């Protein structure tokens, strides 16, 4: 910090010295008895003198008319004390001796101040020529590598048409995923194809000649090795700088005071989360050594611990519909055309016009559609009273109901808060069960008071008949009399 202040003080002192030198030079060039104006007015006078010297007296008269109210151009009048200085500069401008000291000073000042800000430009090191037949091997299994190289060899021999047809044919085959442009192995595969193509289709003799020259004169390799070594050291230094910057960023991230943050919500893991059926964790080494088919199976096939339940079929197996047989209705078949099993007995068949118009389909081809069962014929589900809320719960759902009620109340509150944030309505259904229970107790004509089950239609009709008979006072014995 102190060095920076000393540098700024040094620049300020140098600028003041240069400014004083420029003033001294200008004052020495001005004849005796001429008043030297201040720097701001002096710059205007110098510019005006240069323009008037180029454009003539008409331009001076135009400035005098346009700037009558401007005091900065008062030097154009003969009674102004700075008018002699203007005449002196006008004479120098006409003779070509006028110099812009202010412009030179500002330019020099700007360059002086901008000099320490400039960063040193690093020397660019040209990249060496790449190796022709050397390619870093990606993480791939030996089986996939053999398939890739064999495919690249055939593609180099037969051309791009073979590659296009093969990629279309094996598009769904995971063993040939390296043919897809979005696969990570596709660039490596294309470089291998280029290497095989350069060897098979375009044989060149320059590599052999170069190798022979290297054997004859080993010291000639130094001129090729040195640029590559410089490039390698340069790349290592760049990687080191990037690593240091990453370490600095991690250090700054670690210095964050995490206690300043506010906890919005806490997620708690229960025992059910610990015993949940999740996929087995994969290892990096297993992923690198696995083949393309195994990788595809890892992400697509379900785990063996899972059991997949299938619903029973709702229809019989489908069979193709056979064409209806041609029959002659109302005509007796001759004995020669009769089947041998029937012994030549003729048979006549008569069909109604309606049946003749519509072909008869096999019953096996029509799926069985399950019709909805009326509530009156549905089996009655036994109900149980919940010990927590007192509401009626089906006996088959009582276990799940108890599990939900025994959950941590804090988790339930957090879940309610989350659902209230996601919901677009502010309606609550807290007393729905109580309202339904009160409705059941009041509507005895629709629900049974004892178990809360809906009364069947037969029971309703029976009650209506009983109420009608009691209203008229009619009994079976009275009707007989």
Swiss-Prot record:
This is Pre-mRNA-splicing factor sap114. Belongs to the 40S cdc5-associated complex (or cwf complex), a spliceosome sub-complex reminiscent of a late-stage spliceosome composed of the U2, U5 and U6 snRNAs and at least brr2, cdc5, cwf2/prp3, cwf3/syf1, cwf4/syf3, cwf5/ecm2, spp42/cwf6, cwf7/spf27, cwf8, cwf9, cwf10, cwf11, cwf12, prp45/cwf13, cwf14, cwf15, cwf16, cwf17, cwf18, cwf19, cwf20, cwf21, cwf22, cwf23, cwf24, cwf25, cwf26, cyp7/cwf27, cwf28, cwf29/ist3, lea1, msl1, prp5/cwf1, prp10, prp12/sap130, prp17, prp22, sap61, sap62, sap114, sap145, slu7, smb1, smd1, smd3, smf1, smg1 and syf2. GO terms for cellular component: catalytic step 2 spliceosome; nucleus; U2 snRNP; U2-type prespliceosome. Involved in pre-mRNA splicing. May be involved in endoplasmic reticulum-associated protein degradation (ERAD) and required for growth at low and high temperatures. SURP motif repeats lie at residues 44-86, 147-189. Residues 1-34, 335-373, 452-481 are annotated as: Disordered. Keywords: Chaperone, mRNA processing, mRNA splicing, Nucleus, Repeat, Spliceosome. It is found in: Nucleus. InterPro entries: SF3A1, SF3A1_dom, Surp, SWAP/Surp_sf. Residues 1-15, 345-368, 467-481 have a biased composition (Polar residues). SMART domains: SWAP. GO terms for biological process: mRNA cis splicing, via spliceosome. The gene is sap114. Pfam families: PRP21_like_P (PF12230), Surp (PF01805).
